[in-house]
């Protein structure tokens, strides 16, 4: 069964709904250079993630301008893990891991398997996403799940499938790609970063149903 991350949380009520639905991880977005209704400031990110209970992974999703700034954010916000988007080098990922002893997830474009292979065993997990030109996710666009599954088979690092997932298609995506985890943000929203709690619950349930939609 694929693990589930509910991302782009901006309110305590939405965070609690994700946890109550059984999400394995929750994500808060801060310091990204793109316009997003899901972005919160670092203080709000710290406040939200401080309420995450044990056994649920509190994840900071960010695009800082340097590895040093990523370390600063980790020390300020204190998440369990950081998910990085944008352009990074293997040495920068190693630096962040060494300085903070936090798990580092790296988002890579689904159309760039060579980059995923470059960071295999460097990042703690690879988020295979549909990214825009800046490397940001949250596009709401799907990609070839079977090809993502073939890539995952070649990698050692766990693969998190993202990009255009919803409660209605996540079971099919899991069946096709067999990822370690799935990640959703816009696919379970009402509007402006506010989550649809029913969609969140259905997404978590359906992620565990490879052949059947709830």
Swiss-Prot record:
Keyword set, alphabetical order: Amino-acid biosynthesis, Aromatic amino acid biosynthesis, Isomerase, Tryptophan biosynthesis
Catalytic activity: N-(5-phospho-beta-D-ribosyl)anthranilate = 1-(2-carboxyphenylamino)-1-deoxy-D-ribulose 5-phosphate
Pathway annotation from the record: Amino-acid biosynthesis; L-tryptophan biosynthesis; L-tryptophan from chorismate: step 3/5
A single MF term (Gene Ontology): phosphoribosylanthranilate isomerase activity
Enzyme Commission (EC) number: 5.3.1.24
Enzyme class: isomerase
Record carries keyword Ribosomal protein: no
CDD domains with a match to the protein in the record: PRAI
UniProt GO BP: L-tryptophan biosynthetic process
Gene3D superfamilies per the UniProt record, alphabetical: Aldolase class I
Family of the protein in this entry: Belongs to the TrpF family.
Name the record gives this protein: N-(5'-phosphoribosyl)anthranilate isomerase
